Structures are given as structure tokens and as C-alpha cells.
From Swiss-Prot:
GO cellular component terms listed in the entry, alphabetical order: plasma membrane
Single GO biological process annotation from the record: heme O biosynthetic process
Organism: Pseudomonas paraeruginosa (strain DSM 24068 / PA7)
Subcellular location: Cell inner membrane
UniProt miscellaneous comment: Carbon 2 of the heme B porphyrin ring is defined according to the Fischer nomenclature.
UniProt cross-references to PANTHER family, sorted A to Z: 4-HYDROXYBENZOATE SOLANESYLTRANSFERASE, PROTOHEME IX FARNESYLTRANSFERASE, MITOCHONDRIAL
Name assigned to this protein: Protoheme IX farnesyltransferase 1
NCBIfam families in alphabetical order: cyoE_ctaB (TIGR01473), PRK04375.1-2 (NF003349)
Pathway entry: Porphyrin-containing compound metabolism; heme O biosynthesis; heme O from protoheme: step 1/1
């Protein structure tokens, strides 16, 4: 016991950095930056104002880190069971729950202060809503309550491009909501493919993920159905004249490949299809948003 107390009293800076899930935060900030860039009127404005670029992403990143730290606290028992997470700071006892919560509160307050001071109130309150949606609604309740947890809770994870857009414009509009809808539709096939691959771990931790509660066949069908929805939603930026032909062609090609993987997973026609579908889903989302950016700034490139 003395050793545990000593370890709690001497966490390192790396432990606190790990609490923020830095890789996840970086991905969120990339989508936030994309939202900012898409909200900037190319080619007239060209780029994001430096104040919003730096402080907007700093505030969003701090709040995202706070939500991640709360997730570590709530999931510490689950993390200690699962192979992928059993070495996390709270699971191993390197940081105490009270210390992690205090750290999360500090990050959240700092993030909100930065957003209120350097962006606009709407960005700050939407960021707070996203933080609470992930930390309280998803992690604290939905994750253990329903196999549809990732569908409902996916809205919080889909928020960063909206936050980046609103940091520039100061108001809501159809375009950033469509970006949220794309990530919202992408989340179930992305995450359920991973859940199939790690089904036994989730069952051991008593988390009601869809493959655990309804079986792999049912989950694979829903991955296919959600991928069809995603394919349709991904074409909407072209339909509402948010993007042009370059994006449309990329969305069609990327979506067709995603459907190919979802079908292969459903039919069990390729080895390791679940984890390969999961990995492709990450590539898909990255390239889709890059296509939006290229299409957005293409007129600027043509004028140079």
C-alpha cells in the first residue's frame, strides 16, 4: 500500500500528458483547423486570422484534453481489464482519481477562458457542450447503458469542425452542421469495425458494444447500412454548392472503396476484414476532408 501512495504522490508530466489522450486531441485539432479553413472565404481572405488559429485551437485542445482526463477517471476499472488500456496512468495507479479530476477542471477552465477571451462566446459554449457530451453523457452513462452508445455519443466527437468554423464566423450555418453530420455518420462503421476486432475485450469488461450484445453478423449489417448512409451524406457538400467537382469525384471514389470494405466485412470475403475496415475508415475521413480543402482553395491556386 505504501508503494501505491508514493506512486500517487509522484506522477510525472508524461502521466498528465497521457491523461489528455494527445493523439486523439491532435486529430480533433486537425478537423477543427479544417473547419476554420473552410469557413475562410477563399480566395479573398486566404487564411485563418492568426489569433483565431492559435487561441481557438488552444482553447478547443485544452477542453478536449479535459474531457479525455475525465474519461480516464470514469473508465479506470475498464481500462485495467482491457489489454489496450491497462497501462494507462489511473489503471496502473500512477495518478489518483482526485488528482486527475483536478487536472481536468484546470484544463477546462483554462480552455473556456481562452475561447471567451480570444474567439467568441458561441464557440466557447459549444465547446463546453461537446466536453460535457463526451465526458458526462457518453463516458458516464451511454457507454455502459446501451449498445447504441457510440451512435448517440458520436455527436460530441463530431463537433471539432463545427467549433473551428464558428470560431471564424461567430454563428451557425448549414455547412459546418453538414461537416458534423459526415463525422456522425462515419463514427459507427469506424468504431464498430474496431469493436468486432476487440469483441472479447469489451465482453470481459462488461461494456455493451454492439458485437457483444447482438453478435457480429448483426453488427456487420449495420456497418454496411451506416456506410451507405455515409456515402450519401458525403455527397451533400456538392449538392448544397459547398464544394465542387474535385470534391465530388474524390467523395465518390473514397466512398466506393469504403463500401467495398463494408461489403467484404459483411460477406466475410477477406482475411482480417474488421481491422482493415477500421484502418481504411481513418484514411477515408482524412482524405475526404483534404479533398474538401483542396476544392475550397482551388480557385486561389488558379489565380496564382
Amino acid at each position: 500500500m505504501a508503494t501505491v501512495i508514493d506512486r500517487h504522490s509522484q506522477p510525472t508530466w508524461r502521466d498528465f500528458l497521457e491523461l489528455t489522450k494527445p493523439k486523439v486531441v491532435v486529430l480533433m485539432l486537425i478537423t477543427s483547423l479544417i473547419g476554420m479553413l473552410l469557413a475562410t472565404k477563399a480566395p479573398l481572405d486566404g487564411f485563418v486570422p492568426w489569433q483565431v488559429l492559435i487561441f481557438g485551437n488552444l482553447g478547443i485542445g485544452l477542453c478536449a484534453g479535459a474531457a479525455a482526463a475525465v474519461n480516464h477517471v470514469v473508465d479506470r476499472r475498464i481500462d485495467s481489464i482491457m489489454a489496450r488500456t491497462h497501462k494507462r496512468p489511473l489503471a496502473e495507479g500512477r495518478v489518483s482519481p482526485s488528482m486527475a479530476l483536478g487536472f481536468a477542471l484546470l484544463l477546462a477552465l483554462a480552455g473556456m477562458a481562452v475561447l471567451l477571451a480570444f474567439t467568441n462566446p458561441l464557440t466557447a459554449w459549444l465547446t463546453l457542450a461537446s466536453l460535457l457530451g463526451y465526458a458526462a453523457l457518453y463516458t458516464g452513462f451511454l457507454k455502459r447503458a446501451t449498445p447504441q452508445n457510440i451512435v448517440i455519443g458520436g455527436l460530441a466527437g463530431a463537433a471539432p469542425p463545427l467549433l473551428g468554423w464558428v470560431a471564424i464566423t461567430g454563428h451557425l450555418s448549414a455547412e459546418p452542421l453538414l461537416l458534423v453530420l459526415i463525422i456522425f455518420a462515419w463514427t459507427p462503421p469506424h468504431f464498430w469495425a474496431l469493436c468486432i476486432h476487440r469483441k472479447d475485450e469489451y465482453a470481459k469488461a462488461d461494456i455493451p458494444m454492439l458485437p457483444v450484445t447482438h453478435g457480429e453478423r448483426y453488427t456487420k449489417l449495420h456497418i454496411l447500412l451506416y456506410t451507405l448512409v455515409l456515402f450519401a451524406v458525403s455527397l451533400m457538400p456538392f449538392v448544397i454548392h459547398m464544394s465542387g467537382l474535385v470534391y465530388l469525384l474524390c467523395a465518390l471514389a473514397l466512398g466506393a472503396r469504403f463500401l467495398d470494405w463494408a461489403w467484404a466485412l459483411y460477406c466475410d470475403s477477406r482475411p482480417h476484414a474488421a481491422i482493415r475496415t477500421f484502418k481504411y475508415s481513418i484514411v477515408y475521413l482524412f482524405l475526404l476532408f483534404m479533398a474538401l480543402l483542396v476544392d475550397h482553395y482551388l480557385p486561389l491556386k488558379l489565380l496564382l
